[in-house]
C-alpha cells in the first residue's frame, strides 16, 4: 500500500513539473497601442497592431522594426510627431509578410511646416526623414494618407514590396517645403507602386538603384517629376528592369527624367516610360543628363554610366513657354538602343545643346 502511494505521489509531482516547463506562447490576435513606447515594447506580442491616435515624442521613431512574420499594422485616428531637429526617421517598419494599412478616416501628419525653411536637406534646420521601409520584404503598404513630411517621404530598401493607393500631400509646403521626395528607391527588387497621389516639392519617384520596379497609375503634382537617379557614386549603381506607366505629371519642374553622376560608373538598362501625360511643366518635359555633380548639372557629360535599352512610348503633353520640351545630354557612346514612339511634348523651346543622342530618339 505504501509503495502504491509513493508511486501516485511521484506521478503527480512529475506531472506538475512537466506542466511547469515554459512553452512558447502564441502572440495575441490583436493589440491596440496609444503610445509609441507601448508599440515598441509590445509589437511582437500580437499579430494585429492598431496604432490609435499616437503622438510620437520629439526626436523618437515610431519603431515597428523586427515585427513577427505576418503581422498587420493599422494606423487609426491621427498620428502626430513632436518637434526636434534630427535626422529621423519618424516611422520605421520592417519584417516579412507585413501588411501596413489604415482605418477609415485616419491620417499621418508630419506637420512639416515646423521644419520647412526653403532649404530642405541642404542647410537650415535639420529635418527628419519620414518613413523607412527597409527590409520590409514580401509585404504591402496600402491606403495610407500622409501629410506634410519635413523632407523625404518613403525611403525604400526592400524586396517584394507592394505600395498601393498611398497619398502624400505636401501641398502646404509650396512656398518653403524642399527635398520632399515622395518615393526614394534604392538597393531594392520587385517594388510595385500603384495608384500613388503625390503633391510635393521634389521627385515624385526617384530610383537610385534596384531592379524589377514598377510605378503605375500615379498622379504627381508640384514636384520634380518621375526620375531615374541620380545614378552613380553609391555602393550600388545599377538600375534595371523598370516600368513607369499610365501616370500624370502636372505643375512640376520636370516630366520624366534620367540623371547620372559626372565621372561615375554604373548601368541604367531596360527602363520604360509608357503612357505618361504632362502638363504645366516649368523646366524640362523629357530630360536625360549625364553631367550631375554635387547635385547640380555641369553641362559636361561623361560616359561611365551606360544608359541602354530605354523606351519612351507615348510620353505626351505640354510645358510652359519658357521651358524646354526635350533635352538629352549623353556621354560619347553611352546612350544606346533606345525606342522612341509616340513622344509628343510641345509648348516650350527646342534645345540646341543636345549631345550624343541615341539613334531613334529625337531632341
UniProtKB/Swiss-Prot annotation:
Signal peptide coordinates: 1-20
Gene Ontology molecular function, alphabetical: galacturan 1,4-alpha-galacturonidase activity; polygalacturonase activity
Ranges of the PbH1 repeats in the UniProt entry: 158-187, 188-209, 210-230, 239-260, 268-290, 302-347
Active site residues according to the UniProt entry: 202, 224
SUPFAM superfamilies named in the record: Pectin lyase-like
Main EC class the enzyme belongs to: hydrolase
EC number(s) from the headed UniProt entry: 3.2.1.15
GO terms for biological process, alphabetical: cell wall organization; pectin catabolic process
Example of a GO cellular component annotation carried by this entry: extracellular region
Chief localisation class: secreted
Subcellular location: Secreted
Catalysed reaction, written as an equation: (1,4-alpha-D-galacturonosyl)n+m + H2O = (1,4-alpha-D-galacturonosyl)n + (1,4-alpha-D-galacturonosyl)m
Pfam families membership: Glyco_hydro_28
Prosequence residues removed at maturation: 21-28
Sites where a glycan is attached: 162, 356
Function according to Swiss-Prot or TrEMBL: Involved in maceration and soft-rotting of plant tissue. Hydrolyzes the 1,4-alpha glycosidic bonds of de-esterified pectate in the smooth region of the plant cell wall.
Family assignment from sequence similarity: Belongs to the glycosyl hydrolase 28 family.
Protein name per its UniProtKB record: Endopolygalacturonase B
